[in-house]
C-alpha cells in the first residue's frame, strides 16, 4: 500500500534577510508500507514545528549544512545550492511498526523530516531524538508534543529549572525568609518565553518581567501568562539602538536589579540584562534571534572581569538532555503543571503543510500581533477508510 506524501523542501540557501514562501517548495511523493525493515516504524505527522533556530540551518555558512542536521540521518543536501528537505520537530502517530518499542497508534514526537508521512528506519531512530507522547496527549492536543511537551517546553524547563535554578519564594512553599527573585525574559510572548514566565511565576513565585513586541503581546503576557511587568521593545529608540531606554525601563520595574535572565534574543537585551544583573545573578542562553537573519553572526562582548567578584554565571544550553530524559523528568513535570493550570500553553495555528513557509516567515516579522506562543502547522490527516482505498501502484 502506498500513502501519498507531501514534503517541505528548501530551494536554496537564504544567507540574509527574512525567509519567505519564495524560498521553499512543497513536493509530492508516496510512501510504501510494504517490506518495512525490522525495527522500522512509519509516522504520520499531525503537527509540524516552526522554530527560530531553523533560520540558521538555511544559511550557507552553517556547519550543519555540510552534514545532516538531524542527528546522522541520510538527507540529500546539495552543498552548492543548499537544496534539501526541511527538517525539525514533528508530532505524529505511528501507523505501522516492526519495532517492539513502538505500537501502532502510539503518539510520537521527534526530530524528523517535514513530511506528512515518513519511514523511520532503525538507524534513523537511534540517531535522532524521539520521545513517546502516548499517555500525555491524544489526537485533540497532540500539537503540545512540539510545544509545551516538546522542544520549546524542554528548553523552558531545562533553562529555568536546571540552569537558572530559581529559589522558591515563601509564597509558593519556599523557605519562610526567601523573598521572590526577579527574572527578565526576552521574547516573552514566544513558544519558550511564555512558558518560562508562567513556570517562574506559578512554580517558583518569581517576579517576572517580559520583553516582547507590540501592545497586544505586552498586554497578553501580563493578563494571560501572569507576568508582573511587560516592556515593548518596538517602542525603544535612540542612537544606541534603544539600549539606554531599555536600561531605564528595566530599572523602573526592577530598581534593585534582576537575579536571572532568560536569553533568546541577544543584542541590547543581553546588554541591558548584564547592566541590571545583581551579584550571584544567572543568565541562561538558548538563542540569539536578533542575529539570525544577518549574513554574518556577531555576538555581544562580555566584561568578564566584572563577573568574577559578582559571582555571576552565564550558561548556554540546548533542549536535548531533557528531551532524552538525561536530566530531570520534563514530561512528567510539565504535563502535571498543565493539568494543574500552572502552565497554560498558547498556540498559533497555520492549517496545512503548504502553509509552513508562511508560518516560518511570521517568526521574524517585527511586532507580529497575530502570533503568540508556539507556532504550529497542523496537517489534515486522511481517515482510515481513505488510507485503505489508497492502492499500491
Where do the model's predicted regions map?
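Eukaryotic N-terminal low-complexity, Ser/Thr- and Lys/Arg-rich leader segments
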Residues: 1-30, 35, 381-393
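C-terminal capping/lid region of NAD(P)-dependent oxidoreductase domains
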Residues: 2-4, 342-349, 357-393
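Hydrophobic beta-strand signal
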Residues: 8, 42, 108-109, 184, ...
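Glycine-rich beta-strand-centered segment in the early N-terminal region that forms part
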Residues: 32-50, 57-114
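NAD(P)H dinucleotide-binding glycine-rich loop of Rossmann-like/cofactor-binding domains
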Residues: 78, 84-93, 101-187
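Mid-domain Rossmann-like dinucleotide-binding core that forms the NAD(H)/NADP(H) cofactor-binding site
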Residues: 146-240
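Glycine-rich cofactor phosphate-binding loops and adjacent beta1-alpha1 units
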Residues: 167-169, 173-178, 224-225, 229-314
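Glycine-rich phosphate-binding loop and adjacent beta-alpha segment
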Residues: 204, 221-222, 268-343, 379-393
